[in-house]
Structures are given as structure tokens and as C-alpha cells.
């Protein structure tokens, strides 16, 4: 029986997976590699940093980063993207979840770059998951390019508006394949 702990958030879960046999693995989200619980209250309540499982203390984030960049095939990408409408996130009972899909790969690349482990990103993002599930590797390719861009504050479609992860931030990696397609970026 193969067991995957989806979207781990603690150093305890990292240790548990490391100590388990080869049939145990875990996914790690881009946002849990970038934020800790302080992001929820930075200058006030930040509903767009609220997700479940909730981001934990900084030492847990550090442990997740070390697991992700380790090259250990028991840890692999799991975005857990949650595109809740802005009005539902910014309400008195806001929805949990972070909309990371538009910049997930760029966010992972930023983390791996900061940790000096870009050579291990492909395994984490593209190989370890399929191999764990005994699935063929995808034939497609995505090229990440070191190129700065500013993530839009919101992504809108008609009356629907969603705030993406890294909204308003300038990132230093970009999926080259997306350069011509619509995504939440501002090149100004």
C-alpha cells in the first residue's frame, strides 16, 4: 500500500516520512516553502495567506525547504491550489486556500534557487511523484527562465476576481512556455 501525506507542514511530518519505509511519501506546496504563520498577521490579518493546513512556525518551513531540496524521492510537488473568489477570502468567515497555480513553478524555482539546489528541482517537480505512483514520466517540457516579472494583484474574469499567490511581488523566475499565454503578471 502506497501512502502519501498530502501538503505536509511540519518538521514532524518530514521526520515521519524520512523514518518510514519506501511506501510512504509526502507532497509539499509552494506556499508552505515560502511563508510561515507570521504571514497571516503581517500588518494585520492577511486572508490570502490563510490556508489549511495552516502555515506553521518558521522552523517548520525551514524543515520543509530542506526536505524539498534534499533530492529524496519521498518528497515531491503538490500545489494544492485553491482559487477562491476574493470576496469569499475577504469575508468574516474566509475560505482557506491559496491560489498558487499561476506561479507555482516559479515559486518552487525561487525556493530551490535560494537554497542552491536548482539541479534538484526537476526531480522534485516532475519525476519523484510519477515514479512513486509507478506512472510514466510526462513527455512534455517546461522551461524555467531567470527573468523578473511582477505578479498581478488580482486575476479577473468578469465579476470574478481571485488573488494569486505572490500578488504584487516581483519574482525572478518565469516559465518560458507561459510568456505568450495569459497569466497573472505585470511586465511594467
Which role fits each region the language model picked out?
Residues 105-188:
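Mid-to-C-terminal alpha-helical segments outside catalytic/metal-binding sites
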Residues 2-120:
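Active-site-adjacent C-terminal substructures of enzyme catalytic domains
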Amino acid at each position: 500500500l502506497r501512502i502519501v501525506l498530502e501538503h505536509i507542514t511540519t518538521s514532524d511530518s518530514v521526520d515521519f516520512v524520512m523514518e518510514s519505509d519506501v511506501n510512504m511519501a509526502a507532497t509539499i506546496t509552494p506556499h508552505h516553502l515560502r511563508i510561515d504563520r507570521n504571514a497571516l498577521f503581517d500588518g494585520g490579518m492577511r486572508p490570502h495567506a490563510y490556508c489549511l493546513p495552516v502555515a506553521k512556525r518558521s522552523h517548520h518551513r525551514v524543515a520543509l525547504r530542506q526536505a524539498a531540496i534534499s533530492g529524496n524521492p519521498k518528497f515531491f510537488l503538490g500545489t494544492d491550489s485553491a482559487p477562491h473568489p476574493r470576496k469569499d477570502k475577504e469575508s468574516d468567515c474566509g475560505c482557506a486556500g491559496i491560489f498558487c497555480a499561476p506561479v507555482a513553478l516559479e515559486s518552487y524555482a525561487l525556493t530551490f534557487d535560494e537554497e542552491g539546489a536548482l539541479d534538484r528541482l526537476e526531480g522534485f517537480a516532475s519525476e519523484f511523484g510519477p515514479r512513486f505512483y509507478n506512472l510514466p514520466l510526462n513527455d512534455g517540457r517546461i522551461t524555467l527562465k531567470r527573468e523578473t516579472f511582477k505578479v498581478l494583484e488580482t486575476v479577473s474574469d468578469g465579476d470574478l476576481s481571485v488573488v494569486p499567490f505572490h500578488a504584487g511581488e516581483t519574482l525572478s523566475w518565469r516559465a518560458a512556455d507561459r510568456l505568450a499565454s495569459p497569466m497573472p503578471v505585470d511586465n511594467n
